[in-house]
Amino acid sequence: AKSQNNITLSVDVEKIPEMGFVISYLKESMIGMDFDAKGHAEYRIEDMDAIYLTLHNGFAEQKTIYAEKGDHIQLSFDGESMKKTLKMEGVRENIADYLKNVKISWPANKDFALDIKDFVKLLKEKVKENQQLLDSLTPALTKESSKFVKLEKNRIKYMLGLSLLDYPRMHPYMAKIEYTPGDDYYNELKAWLEEDLNSLCLSQYRTLMTEVPTFIMSRKTPIRTPYEKAMKQMEYINNNTKDEQVKQNLLTIIANNYIKDAGIQKSTELDAFYRKHVTDKELLAQYQQTYDSWAAVSPGQPAPDFKAVDISDKEFSLKDFKGKYVCLYLWPCVSPA
């Protein structure tokens, strides 16, 4: 059901896609849609005011759509080709058309041979170039969402800004010189960023706001483990972010992502740091939910019960595996995005 507090996505297909139908948003969120016997699936996104969603029809097709809190977007297609049969209801039509037509022009490899000052100058020109379509459509887009226009400007800016993270690796290769980033490089990194609470729904912004601290903190002392990386990121953000809401959100993003990836077994220092510096009740609740989900499956805890059906329709549950070894057959898949 539609709710003013979340974003709801409904999908109806004539035939369930053979390679699955997945939605992704942000960097860490990729959800496979679970269709019922009638070919219907539904998913709700909470705690997001606005979001860019990518629809993945297996590995063959992708489509980006935009949604805001309170939206109920209904999609339908034949289950084989989104391009030929996709119908959408509940989307903002002008924004949907813009996202269908916008193409991002990136710096060429040879551009990385420029010194950092000239490279940043070129990046800023690229940002303006890539915002031209948006600028030309701003009146029509603003009628549908004033929030989208500003958000899209920032999405383009931070998308191009990701090239700054590649510069230390690409510059010596393209310029055919030895190169160690100096103060000029790190100053440009910092200058590209702005503390903006509204941009936290952008994966590009999140990446830069969390990875730039990694670059800065590893300048003198190498960071060797994911745990060291998370701690250094949180330390830098806590000491250098002025906007308290932005700070606490970034700390939550880092802590949540680390716990999701690595669990809670070796997170005592991170957990204490997080709880000391984050006071927002909603953010604490998000983190606690992630923490508790891992605590439930940590070593020594009873295995959660489940029910599953094999290819012969025989039902299994946890008790059927008591005292037995279980072979897990995993398919390592990668996101095509």
Role assignments for model-derived ranges:
Residues 245-310, 319-321:
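N-proximal helix/coil linker or "cap" segments that precede and/or mark the start of modular domains
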Residues 3-151, 164-166, 173:
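A non-transmembrane, solvent-exposed segment enriched in polar/low-complexity residues
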Residues 322-323, 327-337:
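Conserved redox-active cysteine motifs that mediate thiol-disulfide chemistry
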